[in-house]
Structure formats: structure tokens, C-alpha cells
């Protein structure tokens, strides 16, 4: 069964086409890499999946729900790690997860959630003293509250050193082993090839290829990164909080 289905999706902002005729299927339990340079339409696609913006044309189904009709049901079963989201310096790691649980109105063991992302020993520390990698993992722990069926990760390795990026990939693999579907957006192929079953590439808002990372790497001459923007990125509202579906906001395109 498909976890994500997009059929002929196009999104225009006045005279700018952010996404053009995108058709894509992600199976349940799959780790899908969504690649493209900044401004390629990745963040707009994520916003469409979460019904933060409506497509100009096309249909979108997530976890069996039509996003236009059942967006709340989609967000209740989806955990989001948005690009650029930061933590509250004066709150402990445990308090962040407790707040996430309260916002989602679910029962959750904060220490168990932090254990899943390797932060059990830092649960009582204020997040202001966390490293960049620890902050990213804390936001992921918040996204995991409620055991979502789908994880959407928007540039989860952005700003991380190699060790931090490796830790993030290991967590993604661990969640995939639990049966979670993962939609992993990035502009660097090497960040997703170790964890993803398939990879889709976006260029200038259009789908360029969907295949295994092995075939895509061979076809691209072993290039590891997709860094050159085809056009300036679109800027939308600030990134969404991973806490409460009814208070989330659209994902912001990377500057």
C-alpha cells in the first residue's frame, strides 16, 4: 500500500511555477530520498503533503487520506522535522518532549523518546547547552512523539558535522526498522544513499528521475551533491513546529 501518492501535482505562486506535474508514489515502510538543489521545489512539495499549501492542480493522498479533505488526520499520523527549527534554550530536553506530548494530546514517555535519539543522558540539561547535532536529535524526538506512521525530514543533516550526520542516518534506519515510512529531503546524495530505498530528484520544480541511489549515482557519474540552484528559492512563512498539528506552519524554503 502506498503511504504517499502524488498525481500530476502542480503548484504556482502567481507567475512562478514551484512544482510542475509531479507524480510520485512512496510505499509504506519505505525510506524515500527527495533530492534537489535549493529552490527545486522540495519544501513546496512537503508543504503540499501536509496541506499547508494547496496544489494548483493534481491530487495528493497521504496515509490513505485525501490531504484536501482530511489534512488533520494526515498530520496526526505524521512527524515532521522542519528545516531551520530551533529549540528553547531554557527548557530541558525532557521538557521539550513533554510539551510535544501535551500539544499532540498523547501519552508519551519523554525519557523513552530521548533514548530513541541518543539523548537519554542529556534529558535534564537545558537545550541551550546542546550541540547542533543534539538539537537536531531533540527536534526529531519531539517529532517521534505519538509514534507517527510517517516521518518527513526536511534537510535533517543541514549544518551537522560528519559525526552528527552519521548519527542522524543511524536514527533514520532505526525508525525504518520499526516500520515507519520516511520521506527524507536533502540536496546531498551521499546523505541519503546509505539509508534510502529509492531516490527522487527534483530540478527547477520538475521531477528529473526516480530510481535506486545506485542507478542514479551511476547515471550521474558518481557525483555526490546537487548544489547548484536552478533559480532563486521561494520564501514562504517560518518553518513549522513539530509539536501540534493545528498550530503548525508551512516549511520555509532554504535561503
Kindly give the residue locations of the regions a language model identified.
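Residues that form or immediately flank small-molecule/cofactor binding pockets and catalytic motifs
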Residues: 67, 212, 250
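Short, surface-exposed loop and linker segments with low hydrophobicity and enrichment for Pro/Ser/Thr
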Residues: 89-91, 133, 217-220, 255
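Short, flexible cytosolic linker that couples an ABC transmembrane/permease module to its adjacent nucleotide-binding
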Residues: 112, 213-216
